[in-house]
Amino acid sequence: MPGSEKPGPTFLLCSHYDTKIFDTFRFVGANDGGSSTGLLLEMARVLGHHPDLAKKVELVFFDGEEAFETFSDTDGLYGSRYFARQIEPNRKQFRGGILFDMVGDRSLDITLPPDSPAQMTQDIFASAEALKVRSQFTYSSLEITDDHTPLNAIGVPTIDLIDFDYSPWHTAGDTIDKLSAESLQVVGSVAAYYLAEFALK
């Protein structure tokens, strides 16, 4: 019957779960791949207690974020490029998205890249301010190519919550002892507040 279908999700929460492949050392990727994926799984658990919010959210786990050689138009972001192509015909269904990447650093400093959608940036900062963690969310002047890039390119405004000031990035030192449960709590709480008070209101 016309009008009988339930409305689909309108907001994306994303992470990549792959890790960089190195021939010369064992790369664990505790922060770069692991932290954001763990956070997204916890967001799923939390949203399960809030069905009115949960039905509006789609969780997306990307593979192939890392480049085999060097990031380019043809290397890296394989999963998000594919996903963006799949949803492009129905892109207006989605009001926006959050990408989590490298969010577990003990010395947390989420640096929003220059391509962050302006209104989303303001609302994320307002959410962080409300939770008294605004000092851990700042701007970055560094252009970052990440899984949010293909989504922004098709017109789904997506913000990259990333701590790129992380010295063990792409080294053997990216291990779980560098991570903090408190940092994950901060990012998850800000995202949840943003969903409830801004994105899905």
Model-inferred region functions:
Residues M1-E5, F83-N90, H148-P150:
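Short amphipathic alpha-helices and their capping/turn segments at secondary-structure boundaries
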Residues M1-R26, H49:
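Soluble metallo-hydrolase cores and metallopeptidase-like ectodomains found primarily
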Residues K6-Y17, K55, I98, I159-L161:
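Short coil-to-beta-strand
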Residues H16-K20, G64-E65, V103, F164-S167:
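Short connector loops/turns at beta-strand edges and beta->alpha or beta->beta junctions
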Residues K20-T24, F68-E69, S167-A172:
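Short acidic/His/Gly/Ser-rich catalytic and metal-binding motifs that mark active-site loops
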Residues T24-A126, K132, S140-E143:
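Acidic/histidine-rich catalytic neighborhood of metal-dependent amide-processing enzymes
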Residues G96, D105-K201:
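Active-site-adjacent substrate-binding region
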